[in-house]
Design a protein with these regions (language model features):
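Residues at the C-termini of beta-strands that transition into short coil/loop
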Residues: 67, 74-76, 123, 142, ...
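Accessory terminal helices/loops
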Residues: 14, 24-55, 252-311
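Metallo-beta-lactamase
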Residues: 48-60, 65-66, 93, 100-101, 141-207, 213, ...
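Active-site HxH/HxHxD metal-binding segment of metal-dependent hydrolases
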Residues: 102-196, 235, 280-297
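Sec-dependent signal peptide recognition
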Residues: 9-16
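Conserved beta-strand hairpin/beta-sheet module of binuclear metal-dependent hydrolase folds
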Residues: 57-111, 219-234
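N-terminal secretory signal peptides that target proteins for export/translocation
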Residues: 1-8
Length: 311
């Protein structure tokens, strides 16, 4: 979910997919097995120097004002470098993902807007739903996978995410590694592909883009050409090895989004960097074809996973 490779003038894409010897019985998301040593030293990412930072009182987060009334809420002190997005309309705001739940994201949101806030997750992995329990108006995809994950994640499954290796800095005082967990949350409305959210003068459309997980979505602002893309694409290893992943389904989702590229101006990924070029989806599609056709060999890494690097 993160990487040491930076975007330069040429796209660098690394995929991590399940090898034939990967055990489908593996429990949890074995994150730390692929953390690069010294990842903290690669920070800050250069893109942030060119963005307007907004001061907030909760220092776990960094907030950046993007174009078109969008705020990127970034967690740089944890190795996932997760990014949630607050999107403002005239009458409502939408929070796309709620992060790891290490810092209280609701405190940040309340400083950025007085509008009522609806929450929608790009998918229900733990690093995207950590702050859901802080909100009452939650939309979620109507899938069995989603319904299973509303119960949250136990300390056993997520405690490595706040281990020394996973952090670049100190935890908030209220976080105890022995008791840290992802809380359960209540969904107000279950939704499906094509659902539209009216924020007042701004319409967002939910696009079902499964593959990384069965409930993965992208969020489209067609009028402005913006696409919040979750974990489908970002600057880093794109995880396609956990049991809930389906490579063929993921490819179909990427192909769907590639058809939209002519109408897009900006991608907002969920990790590492808040801005990516829509044309990056073409490179991702090509990489997936090469993996599926066996025209490139992967390198076996921890857990029997295969790593593919594309430039």
């Amino acid at each position: 979910m993160r990487v040491d490779l930076e975007m330069t003038k040429r796209l660098k894409l690394l995929l991590v997919v399940a090898g034939y010897i990967y055990s489908q019985g593996t429990s949890g998301i074995d994150s730390l097995s692929i953390i690069s040593e010294g990842w903290c030293h690669d920070l800050p990412r250069t893109i942030y120097a060119n963005l307007e930072r907004v001061n907030v009182s909760n220092k776990w987060f960094e907030v950046y004002r993007l174009d078109n009334d969008v705020f990127a809420i970034y967690e740089p002190q944890q190795w996932q470098e997760v990014i949630s997005y607050l999107i403002l309309g005239k009458e409502k705001a939408l929070l796309f993902d709620t992060g790891n739940g290490i810092g209280k994201i609701s405190e940040v949101v309340n400083e950025l807007t007085i509008l009522p806030v609806v929450v929608l997750n790009s998918h229900t992995h733990f690093d995207h739903i950590g702050g859901n329990s802080e909100f009452r108006d939650i939309l979620a995809m109507d899938t069995g996978y989603t319904r299973n994950n509303v119960d949250g994640y136990s300390n056993e499954l997520v405690r490595e995410e706040i281990s020394e290796e996973a952090l670049c800095g100190s935890l908030p005082a209220e976080i105890n590694p022995a008791t840290y967990y992802t809380p359960s949350f209540i969904v107000k409305t279950f939704i499906r592909d094509g659902y539209k959210i009216d924020l007042g003068g701004r319409i967002l459309e939910v696009l079902s883009t499964p593959g990384h997980t069965p409930d993965a979505i992208s969020l489209l602002d067609l009028d402005l050409g913006l696409l919040c893309i979750g974990d489908i694409y970002y600057e880093g290893p794109i995880w396609l090895f956990v049991p809930e992943t389906d490579l063929d389904v993921f490819y179909n989702s990427v192909k769907r989004l590639c058809n939209m590229v002519p109408h897009l101006t900006t991608l907002h990924p969920a990790h590492n960097s808040p801005i990516a070029q829509p044309q990056s989806l073409y490179a991702l599609k090509k990489a997936l074809i090469n993996v599926q056709n066996g025209t490139i060999s992967g390198k076996v890494i921890s857990g029997g996973r295969l790593e593919y690097i594309f430039q």
